[in-house]
Amino acid sequence: MSPYISLLKPRVIWLLILASVAGYIYGGGGVDSRLFSLLAVAFLSTGGSAAFNHYWERDIDALMTRTFKRPLPSGLITPNAALAYSLALSATGISLGFLLLGLLPGLFVLLGWLFYAVVYTIVLKRRTWLNIFGGGFAGNAVFLGGYALAKGTVDLPAVLISFAIYLWTPSHIWALAFKYRGDYKRAGVPMLPALIKEERAVAVISAINAAAAAYILWLYLQFGGGAGGAIVALGVAATIATSIYAAVKKTEEAMWKMYKASSPMLTLFLIALMIQRYRL
């Protein structure tokens, strides 16, 4: 993979892009020119913020076994080149958000970038274990941006649905951090699993993960319907099952299984919202 593609964190941003599309389709949008504009804007803005994260965290990435081979610590890209690249992508994405999508969707594009690149990456990540709760609003923003593009406004159902992404984020990130808690301790990054006893961390993360799954099921019962319910139930069941398994076993392997199940659950939920839009 090209180092410049790696800077975009494609394995991370694809789910955010899907969330923006789900918001648009659920809000009443269709397969049209606005959808393709949304895809371009979402790719540029989320990719730009991810690249900025690479630039800002290059020092701690060099200290962690999970990240030391990233383009900046490994010397494949210079810091100045990465910064210029990230800012160019970000500025283009945010500008096009306002120009192509409109004021309200563009505002959500800007807010999504600010919450991840500034609030999470610059301000909170190295200071407090609550960092993820500030950065998590970036997930709300991508869904709401797509929804606002379709509806022209934002309502309570959209806000509640956007919190599915917000509540999914802490347990997903912390389950990954649990596996690499030694890295975070070494780098001095205050992720929760690196700060508390392992058994306590497992209990907290698995409980939050199960709660997020239950919230997603409740959301779909309230605002969804149709054939999509089956796939939501499948994702929720797998997530709750792996959460219980992790809570009982209290092993790194069990936590990893829980981590691997959480992204498919959110993906299935977002797909189900789009299916529901067409009353399938």
Curated annotation (Swiss-Prot):
Q: What subcellular locations does the record give?
A: Cell membrane
Pathway, per record: Porphyrin-containing compound metabolism; heme O biosynthesis; heme O from protoheme: step 1/1
Record flagged with keyword Transmembrane helix: yes
Q: Where the protein is mainly located, per its record?
A: membrane
Topology relative to the lipid bilayer, per the entry, is: Multi-pass membrane protein
GO cellular component annotations of the record: plasma membrane
Reaction catalysed by this chain? heme b + (2E,6E)-farnesyl diphosphate + H2O = Fe(II)-heme o + diphosphate
- Name the InterPro entries for this protein: Protohaem_IX_farnesylTrfase, UbiA_prenyltransferase, UbiA_prenylTrfase_CS, UbiA_sf
Reported EC number(s) for this entry are 2.5.1.141
What are the BP-aspect GO terms? heme biosynthetic process; heme O biosynthetic process
Q: What UniProt keywords apply to this chain's record, in alphabetical order?
A: Cell membrane, Heme biosynthesis, Membrane, Transferase, Transmembrane, Transmembrane helix
GO MF entry, a single one: protoheme IX farnesyltransferase activity
Transmembrane region(s): 12-32, 35-55, 76-96, 98-118, 129-149, 158-178, 199-221, 226-248, 255-275
The family database entries (Pfam families) matched by this protein are listed as: UbiA
CDD domains given in the database record: PT_UbiA_Cox10
Additional remark text: Carbon 2 of the heme B porphyrin ring is defined according to the Fischer nomenclature.
The record's function comment reads: Converts heme B (protoheme IX) to heme O by substitution of the vinyl group on carbon 2 of heme B porphyrin ring with a hydroxyethyl farnesyl side group.
Family that this chain belongs to: Belongs to the UbiA prenyltransferase family. Protoheme IX farnesyltransferase subfamily.
Q: What is this protein called?
A: Protoheme IX farnesyltransferase 2
